[in-house]
Amino acid sequence: MTKHIIVIGGGLGGISAAIRMAQSGYSVSLYEQNNHIGGKVNRHESDGFGFDLGPSILTMPYIFEKLFEYSKKQMSDYVTIKRLPHQWRSFFPDGTTIDLYEGIKETGQHNAILSKQDIEELQNYLNYTRRIDRITEKGYFNYGLDTLSQIIKFHGPLNALINYDYVHTMQQAIDKRISNPYLRQMLGYFIKYVGSSSYDAPAVLSMLFHMQQEQGLWYVEGGIHHLANALEKLAREEGVTIHTGARVDNIKTYQRRVTGVRLDTGEFVKADYIISNMEVIPTYKYLIHLDTQRLNKLEREFEPASSGYVMHLGVACQYPQLAHHNFFFTENAYLNYQQVFHEKVLPDDPTIYLVNTNKTDHTQAPVGYENIKVLPHIPYIQDQPFTTEDYAKFRDKILDKLEKMGLTDLRKHIIYEDVWTPEDIEKNYRSNRGAIYGFVADKKKNKGFKFPKESQYFENLYFVGGSVNPGGGIPMVTLSGQQVADKINAREAKNRK
């Protein structure tokens, strides 16, 4: 008899797992509480402006292409992606700008401010990150290793310690090789992909730089939601039954084994395996009602990553100095990280990510106008949450900073505005305390590891998404879905012997 898989949540991890399980011959039902597939890969359109509500950067497209190749299809027949050789522009408080290009040579050619020594150091750092990327690819990505003990067993103790560089934090690894203060800050902020602090995260995450340099940075034409739409279409073609607007209220268990789910309609649906794309702690807390003692233990080890104050602005002008992707850096990177990740306050001088897709895709705003998305990282929802007044003051701080750093009269030109706070993120995606990137990567607390993909408490329960390994970011959550499918397939193959 064909075994039945239930997938809770249609984020990229969930839809990826559903596709791979269907391709492997299982009966698959996916339940998504929202009316769209893609999770945080969401879309907002108003007054002629289009915005990606969630991620705006596509990297490692081969991870997505593999899903189509398993079905002997081509992703290019479903969605169009465009490589961006100019990866982003960095603005600094003293007026300095640095353009990051794909390739160290190209970056040097486009930045007269960078010396020969700067370029040599940047190349040296790239070589270092390449070594880390290569070894993580062998075990962490290809085999879905979930814990430090598994890493050590796979690579050997000395090899793992040296090549994963567990001795240093990410910022220490950067500062050891880079002397230019602007490059130090820019490279440190690659940690944005996982919503953590480069001063706390392990050096292994330095691989993010090589990943982007080697695999490129891409734009999904028309908006990144088209990628989710493509995966949804593939899933339906493979026979996945997708239920949108369908909320799972409870996971049923019997003798430490999951047996099915109860929907908000009261209907019970039986399952042989359950894959939750809901974050791990909210799954245990709200769907299984795990005891307080075990929940508290998990929360101590796995603290939520950062959230964000997300502004979607339609402006009645154009700012020629902006690139597609931009960063407006803080005066004091260490203080910014401290305030967000340790003091848990809204930062005084945040680093701001600003994306302006209209620079590449003119369909995203009316002629002569621009669509600007603004995202500074802020703490996840605290026991004493920030107030509406707190957010209003923070909004003014953001706009003051952007105007001061070159976006003249930005306030006057705003004709459309939509804002998402951590509370909105929590409400729409059931994310843990409104975190965007799952759990924080911390060298001391968790060595940069997230939750294992297989439940330690209940048989036949698996997790995908940003709260499990290999981590946050759209390629990683998509890969987590494929890795879970591999684990279930391997388990079933073993059971048949």
From Swiss-Prot:
One of its GO terms (molecular function) is oxidoreductase activity. It catalyses: all-trans-4,4'-diaponeurosporene + 2 AH2 + 2 O2 = 4,4'-diaponeurosporenal + 2 A + 3 H2O. Keywords: Carotenoid biosynthesis, FAD, Flavoprotein, Oxidoreductase, Virulence. InterPro entries: Amino_oxidase (IPR002937), Carotenoid/retinoid_OxRdtase (IPR014105), FAD/NAD-bd_sf (IPR036188). The gene is crtP. Its EC number is 1.14.99.-. One of its GO terms (biological process) is carotenoid biosynthetic process. The lineage of its organism: Bacteria, Bacillati, Bacillota, Bacilli, Bacillales. FAD binds at residues 7-19. Pathway: Carotenoid biosynthesis; staphyloxanthin biosynthesis; staphyloxanthin from farnesyl diphosphate: step 3/5. It is an enzyme of class 1 (oxidoreductase). The keyword Flavoprotein applies. It comes from the Bacteria. It comes from Staphylococcus aureus (strain MW2). Its cofactor is FAD. Belongs to the carotenoid/retinoid oxidoreductase family. CrtP subfamily. It holds the Pfam family Amino_oxidase. This is 4,4'-diaponeurosporene oxygenase. Involved in the biosynthesis of the yellow-orange carotenoid staphyloxanthin, which plays a role in the virulence via its protective function against oxidative stress. Catalyzes the oxidation of the terminal methyl side group of 4,4'-diaponeurosporene to form 4,4'-diaponeurosporen-4-al.
